[in-house]
């Protein structure tokens, strides 16, 4: 899947002012994604989290800035990078956001499918 979409998908990534910026960007690049837009307004660690009320990637409000980047997929991690939020652009240009359970199900599906090959 990454080989097919790595050069096509545009991904915005935000660590929400936390510690995961460099590692998250590097992980996406090493996985094979080539169109990564880091959300510069939220990239640098900053404890007061000036651009969000709560730096929780499960709250759709944290994607307000990254939506302006116009990416196909939005990824956000919380400040200590142990939770992830995902949004994707729909045909009408709006974004849908996945729940934690949906993200986990997709990851398990990907892992099991990859093991069969």
For the regions a protein language model found, what residue spans apply to each?
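Phosphate-binding chemistry for phosphorylated carbohydrates and sugar-nucleotides
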Residues: 1-117
């Amino acid at each position: 899947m990454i080989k097919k979409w790595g050069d096509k998908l545009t991904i915005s990534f935000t660590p929400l002012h936390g510690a995961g910026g460099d590692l998250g960007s590097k992980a996406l690049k090493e996985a094979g994604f080539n169109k990564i837009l880091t959300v510069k307004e939220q990239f640098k660690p900053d404890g007061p989290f000036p651009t969000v009320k709560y730096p929780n990637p499960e709250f759709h409000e944290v994607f307000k800035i990254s939506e302006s980047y116009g990416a196909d997929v939005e990824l956000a991690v919380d400040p200590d990078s142990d939770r992830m939020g995902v949004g994707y652009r729909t045909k009408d240009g709006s974004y849908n956001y996945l729940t934690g359970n949906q993200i986990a199900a997709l990851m398990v599906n990907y892992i099991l499918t990859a093991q069969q090959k």
